Amino acid sequence: MKGLILVGGYGTRLRPLTLTLPKPLVEFGNRPMILHQIEALAKAGVTDIVLAVNYRPEVMVSTLKKYEAEYGVTITFSVEEEPLGTAGPLKLAEKVLKKDDTPIFVLNSDVICDYPFQELADFHKTSGGKATIVATKVDEPSKYGVIVHDRDTPNLIDRFVEKPVEFVGNRINAGLYILNPSVIDLIEMKPTSIEKETFPILVENKELYSFDLEGYWMDVGQPKDFLSGTVLYLTALSKKEPKKLCNEKFIHGGNVLVDPSAKIHPSALIGPNVVIGPNVVVGEGARIQRSVLLSNSEVKDHAWVKSTIVGWNSRIGKWARTDGITVLGDDVEIKNEVYVNGAKVLPHKSISSNVEHEAIIM
């Protein structure tokens, strides 16, 4: 089988982190985001993976090529000269994706979940449709495009309703699909939306089905959702692979993932819902909640870090406090006793006075 990961462009929603690394290489759960997907695809028997990119492919090539041998897959970069939307990349990579008649997994690189690729492939084969969308249930369907099913045929999609005013269902497109190679014949070589231009054709021909996703799901393409997705990921890890989580005495509230190379003072309080990356240093009496500390960062004595993504090589000073979905880019310094609330701080900046309201610090 084959897989296409829609990597896309600049990752502006996740700035300032993506000013340093392309979004797929930003660590989620201490591993590059895209590695979670490559591993899951390989586990389901995928042998050819295409990464559809239009921004800084050269940075990703060297990093991702080493995973080919590790996971027994061939990774091809399909570089768009202009953004081709969500369907155009399938046409651009047609040579690889249509080399045999096995189905193609398609997924957005921002999506984190329990990737049900094997179950999806089995369902797709049984349904007899040309394509299957993975659907996830949401609490507020009025914010999304909702899937409405055929009354007579289970899982057959009848139509999509964009941001419905009245309740018509609570299942939405989760950004994962499986397609027969023949679907590529419906796509033109131009910027095209698979959701708005390709799927309606399949719906009209009664060839599009949905598969219900069990477990967690999150689009982690922006900081608020990156942190929420981290909570969901750690919760899933606590149920499936609890030994991966830290259980040292400094853990407070559980669900903490710590790289073995991190140095944490025994008097610190860490948790719940924290990821601490390689070579991170946490000082005496520091308090960290619902945050991600990327590699080589430091939280000094008695600092309080909450709802924060601390970028690579960044430093939070003694008695400083961060909160309110704060994101520090690469090599940022928060001086001692400074309060930062909801700021996005670009790389190589030093903050020496309080930031009390949401702001972008350039």
From Swiss-Prot:
Keyword Oxidoreductase: no
Short name of one Pfam family: GMPPB_C
Domain of life of the native organism: Eukaryota
EC nos: 2.7.7.13
Localisation per UniProt entry: Cytoplasm
Listed pathway(s): Nucleotide-sugar biosynthesis; GDP-alpha-D-mannose biosynthesis; GDP-alpha-D-mannose from alpha-D-mannose 1-phosphate (GTP route): step 1/1
CDD domains tied to this protein: M1P_guanylylT_B_like_N
GO cellular component entries: cytoplasm
Predominant localisation class: cytoplasm
Enzymatic reactions: alpha-D-mannose 1-phosphate + GTP + H(+) = GDP-alpha-D-mannose + diphosphate
Record key words, sorted: Cell cycle, Cytoplasm, GTP-binding, Nucleotide-binding, Nucleotidyltransferase, Transferase
Protein name (database record): Mannose-1-phosphate guanyltransferase
Record organism: Debaryomyces hansenii (strain ATCC 36239 / CBS 767 / BCRC 21394 / JCM 1990 / NBRC 0083 / IGC 2968)
